[in-house]
Amino acid sequence: MFINKLSQEVKISGIDKKQIYSNGTFESLVVAVEKGMVVPAQPAPADAGLYLISGKIEFEIAGKKTCVEADDFFSFSKGELHGLTALENSKFIISRNVFE
């Protein structure tokens, strides 16, 4: 059994990010964003998967916008430009390789 305290919490206005697992090469984060928060498009540092726990976001990958709702999952590749706009207060888990 592995138990990890929610450590390395990062709070920025409109966004709350907590690392819930890391083994040095892979990590999982829980991210909460407030309605109206915009994260500008940026290249993905690694292949990643995102699972939306609650809320609704507009996620942009390579210029294409998609509405993502609670219980949706999708993945994207290292280097892909991605960003989001929170349409509601939302919470998601993102899992990714730390080093590729």
Where are these regions (language model features)?
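A short, N-terminal "cap"/entry segment at the start of jelly-roll beta-barrel domains
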Residues: M1-T25, E60
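Conserved short histidine dyad/triad with adjacent acidic residue
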Residues: G14, E27-A44
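Glycine- and acidic-residue-biased ligand/ion/polar-headgroup-sensing regions
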Residues: A46-I57
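A cytosolic small-molecule/anion-sensing beta-strand core signal
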Residues: I53-S54, E69-A70, E88
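Short acidic-glycine-tyrosine-enriched beta hairpin
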Residues: G63-K78
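Ligand-binding loop in jelly-roll beta-barrel domains
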Residues: K78-E100
